[in-house]
Amino acid sequence: MTRAFLRSGYTTGACAAAAAKGAAEMLRDGQVIDRVEIILPGGELVPFTLRNQQLGDKFASCSVIKDAGDDPDITNGAEINVSLTIEPAPPGTKGEIAVSGGTGIGKVTKPGLAVPVGEWAINPVPRKMIRVVINEVFAIRCVPSLMKVTVSIPNGEELAKKTLNARLGIIGGLSILGTTGIVKPISAKAWTDTIDAAIDVALACGSKTLILSTGRTSELVAERHLQLGKLTQEEAFIMMGDHVGYALKTCAAKGVREIVIAGQFAKLLKVACGHEQTHVSSSELDLQQLVSWLGPDPRTSGLVLLARRANTARQVLEESGNDPVLMAAVCERVKGFAARLVQESSIKVLLAGYGQEVLYFG
């Protein structure tokens, strides 16, 4: 399947808004329906199929099954349920729409996110979408009394264990997310959105130094070396994955003053070669670049033949016996690359060994 034919899907926020509209229409008309259409923030009119409909005197609920298209999304196939309950409004008050979470929706426990601490993890755009569709349904009669809207995901707590929610301080379930309502297939947006949120949380929690890791192994090494829980708080550790350039530029934009880049040799070599995105198949070119660095230095010229014959960066490192000059040559170039993107920050590099030891820090 080529990228051109990959199918887009819909966010949890769009699904929640569609389910809310379905429940509202059933309440208004007193009959079960199977389908609704909503207008997404970008103006697209999209149909959604409803499931598990229930209708009572002052209660209605239904679900939408999330279709993430061809995006490998953890929440693809999840049931997004919305229940609406009408209650008498206090005397002298107007109709109100109160949006809250239920089973499988997380609560925010750390500052820095779009939702305040203590609130359900239903982001502002989905909240607005839900209120808009309910107001549309009751446009003629006006919203009756107090309308309580509860969003839930039956297996949300279990699914959340496969996400970074807990790290961001979202506990007990998933988030209801989305700004456009549309999930782009195989896009980096979900990851870069998480990087944005993680940096915001870290700064809001008072972290002065942020540790950006290329993967979980290097992050674990950094946590031990930097004494997680003693010298460094957990919010400071941010998994940037392959999005090195994006993470560094975001740190620069948000005024981060001290950064540690943690990674293993192969990933750090890509960064040293100037790759802002390290998910690239350029091992041969990276090794050629490494050779050009090693040759002029008499301390590493003996490694040139090894680097030319090697198939991988890891092979060069291991067969060099973790040569300290080799490691410094790469790590110093990582610092130089980062300094060009984050000019006002202090940069350090932590090289994690393949045996989960620290090979270089400085």
Curated annotation (Swiss-Prot):
One of its GO terms (molecular function) is cobalt-precorrin-5B C1-methyltransferase activity. The keyword Transferase applies. The keyword Transferase applies. Pathway: Cofactor biosynthesis; adenosylcobalamin biosynthesis; cob(II)yrinate a,c-diamide from sirohydrochlorin (anaerobic route): step 6/10. Its EC number is 2.1.1.195. Keywords: Cobalamin biosynthesis, Methyltransferase, S-adenosyl-L-methionine, Transferase. It is an enzyme of class 2 (transferase). It catalyses: Co-precorrin-5B + S-adenosyl-L-methionine = Co-precorrin-6A + S-adenosyl-L-homocysteine. GO terms for biological process: anaerobic cobalamin biosynthetic process; methylation. Gene3D superfamilies: CbiD-like. Pfam families: CbiD. InterPro entries: CbiD, CbiD_sf. Belongs to the CbiD family. This is Cobalt-precorrin-5B C(1)-methyltransferase. It comes from Geotalea daltonii (strain DSM 22248 / JCM 15807 / FRC-32).
